């Protein structure tokens, strides 16, 4: 395919144009008075969302060069989502502000490499300062506040997530399910999560989120490698007749057997998924036994005299729901309370008897996984469109809460970054020089961008409010919901330090890359290629 090549300023301007389109589409959702965005879907009803990364993933432009700009800024949102699970809109707004500010200086003749070094050093300074200002999360009130803000100022949801964390612990698993009613409910159930994802992406049932979701699934657990497809055929036929999903945990599944499972899945003959067994050695056997107790099943093993090719359906266990991503598996069990409590008691005795600190730690980890259970939030809504939006908000709230527990909280609503802008300006002028100083000042000027946008979305003058916030003490910020200056901690307007930090780091990384771009090579648009071929063929020989 023919390529189009752009150099220097025109290359950077084309990237900026694409970034402008995406940043504006995402920025309208920021803050308590942020608006929604409607996404057209090829199939089904349009989706109404308020989630930055979901909007960013949907935007695809006709112009290949502008689309490259979109892809770059989308990366800032995606990476922030991967690290912190929230703060994607803030990351996008920051990245665009830094690029816009930096473009002016590069166009005026500043050295982009020196500017990038200045941006990196200034960002590192802000990250350290955020960590110094972060307050640890010690009570459920703080957890409620963080969750409420991330769920779009929904206090009920915040309280529900705080309850869930209180019941399953800070390391516990919180799962989202589609409810049957219009109200959102919390339920604590037996279940566990382990660090193994699907063996093949062909098992995925939700391509948008790259997840496998199986409801009312049958469980097959074996401690051997499944090499021959003949071993699986008898049980697969029985499961197909029962018309139930099948979930397999095995030491490994070799190519031939895996190919058979994938083909049957793709043809719709069988709803099947498989993961490798977690852990290794004796720990692997113990963990498989834990899962077997949880799902009321038997481990198919030579030691117990059970063979894969001769088992019946009554040997298989059951789970209410299985969620599998590329990294981990969550099992929500169907209630084998007696078996689970007996197994927990057994593990407790082992903890008392062992002298090894490592062994003790691993046994406690197993006990926490088995006894902690899973908090299931059943999302209720009147329509499917509302349900999807609610699920995205809840997901953000859960991620933000876990991030807050990890690294503490700071004043929210763009306040922290706005206050740190003054501190950073002073540090930059004392510690950086020449074009590195310009890079540092780019970061300092961009730090107020999220606050300005939150205020503008609420219908006020962003620049004026940002200057007023800078003059006030660190905890004082602007509450855009009621247009008042308040103590952000007292008002419950807080952000997880991890979200603020990772958003800034990813924004600075993308801005540095864009500013140091000198050439773009992209595919030529089809219309241009056709025009070129018409011109070539129009000579009069």
From Swiss-Prot:
It catalyses: ATP + H2O + a folded polypeptide = ADP + phosphate + an unfolded polypeptide. Transmembrane segments: none annotated. It comes from Cyanophora paradoxa. Belongs to the chaperonin (HSP60) family. One of its GO terms (biological process) is protein refolding. This is Chaperonin GroEL, cyanelle. NCBIfam families: GroEL (TIGR02348), PRK00013.1 (NF000592), PRK12849.1 (NF009487), PRK12850.1 (NF009488), PRK12851.1 (NF009489). The gene is groEL1. Forms a cylinder of 14 subunits composed of two heptameric rings stacked back-to-back. Interacts with the co-chaperonin GroES. Its main location: plastid. It is found in: Plastid, Cyanelle. GO terms for molecular function: ATP binding; ATP-dependent protein folding chaperone; isomerase activity; unfolded protein binding. Disulfide bonds: none annotated. Keywords: ATP-binding, Chaperone, Cyanelle, Isomerase, Nucleotide-binding, Plastid. SUPFAM superfamilies: GroEL apical domain-like (SSF52029), GroEL equatorial domain-like (SSF48592), GroEL-intermediate domain like (SSF54849). Together with its co-chaperonin GroES, plays an essential role in assisting protein folding. The GroEL-GroES system forms a nano-cage that allows encapsulation of the non-native substrate proteins and provides a physical environment optimized to promote and accelerate protein folding. Its EC number is 5.6.1.7. GO terms for cellular component: cyanelle. It comes from the Eukaryota. Gene3D superfamilies: GroEL, GroEL-like equatorial domain, TCP-1-like chaperonin intermediate domain. ATP binds at residues 29-32, 86-90, 413, 479-481, 495.
């Amino acid at each position: 395919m023919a390529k189009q090549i752009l150099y220097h300023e025109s290359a950077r301007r084309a990237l900026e144009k694409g970034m402008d389109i995406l940043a504006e589409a995402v920025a309208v959702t920021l803050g308590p008075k942020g608006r929604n965005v409607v996404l057209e879907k090829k199939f089904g009803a349009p989706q109404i969302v308020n989630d930055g990364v979901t909007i960013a993933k949907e935007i695809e432009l006709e112009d290949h060069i502008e689309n490259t700009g979109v892809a770059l800024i989308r990366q800032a949102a995606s990476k922030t989502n991967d690290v912190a699970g929230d703060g994607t809109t803030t990351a996008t707004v920051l990245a665009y502000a830094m690029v816009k500010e930096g473009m002016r200086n590069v166009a005026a003749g500043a050295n982009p490499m020196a500017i990038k070094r200045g941006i990196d050093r200034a960002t590192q300074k802000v990250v350290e300062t955020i960590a110094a200002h972060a307050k640890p999360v010690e009570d459920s009130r703080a957890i409620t506040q963080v969750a409420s803000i991330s769920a779009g100022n929904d206090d009920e949801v915040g309280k529900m997530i705080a309850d869930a964390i209180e019941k399953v612990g800070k390391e516990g698993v919180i799962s989202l399910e589609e409810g049957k009613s219009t109200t959102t409910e919390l339920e604590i159930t037996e279940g566990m999560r382990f660090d193994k994802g699907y063996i093949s992406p062909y098992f995925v049932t939700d391509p948008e989120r790259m997840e496998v979701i199986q409801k009312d699934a049958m469980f097959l657990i074996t401690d051997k490698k499944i090499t021959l497809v003949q071993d699986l055929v008898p049980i697969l036929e029985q499961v197909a007749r029962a018309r139930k999903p099948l979930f397999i945990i095995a030491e490994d599944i070799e190519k031939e057997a895996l190919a058979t499972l994938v083909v049957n899945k793709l043809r719709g003959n069988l709803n099947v998924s498989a993961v490798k067994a977690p852990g290794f050695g004796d720990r692997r056997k113990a963990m498989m036994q834990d899962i077997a107790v949880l799902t009321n099943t038997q481990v198919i093993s030579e030691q117990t005299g059970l063979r894969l090719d001769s088992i019946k359906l009554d040997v298989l266990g059951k789970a209410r729901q299985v969620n599998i991503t590329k990294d981990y598996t969550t099992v929500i069990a169907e209630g084998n309370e007696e078996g689970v409590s007996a197994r927990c008691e057994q593990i407790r005795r082992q903890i008392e008897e062992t002298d090894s600190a490592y062994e003790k730690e691993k046994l406690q980890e197993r006990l926490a996984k088995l006894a902690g259970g899973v908090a299931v939030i059943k999302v209720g809504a009147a329509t499917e469109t509302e349900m999807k939006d609610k699920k995205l908000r809840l997901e953000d709230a859960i991620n933000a809460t876990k991030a807050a527990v990890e690294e503490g909280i700071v004043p929210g609503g763009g306040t922290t970054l706005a206050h740190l802008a003054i501190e950073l300006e002073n540090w930059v002028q004392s510690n950086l020089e020449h074009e590195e100083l310009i890079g540092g000042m780019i970061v300092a000027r961009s730090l107020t961008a999220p606050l300005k946008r939150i205020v503008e979305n609420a219908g006020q003058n962003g620049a004026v409010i940002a200057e007023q916030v800078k003059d006030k003490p660190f905890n004082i910020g602007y509450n855009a919901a009621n247009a008042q200056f308040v103590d952000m901690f007292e008002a419950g307007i807080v952000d997880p330090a991890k979200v603020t930090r990772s958003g800034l780091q990813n924004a600075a990384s993308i801005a540095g890359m864009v500013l140091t771009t000198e050439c773009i090579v992209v595919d030529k648009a089809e219309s241009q290629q056709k025009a070129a071929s018409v011109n070539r063929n129009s000579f009069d020989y």
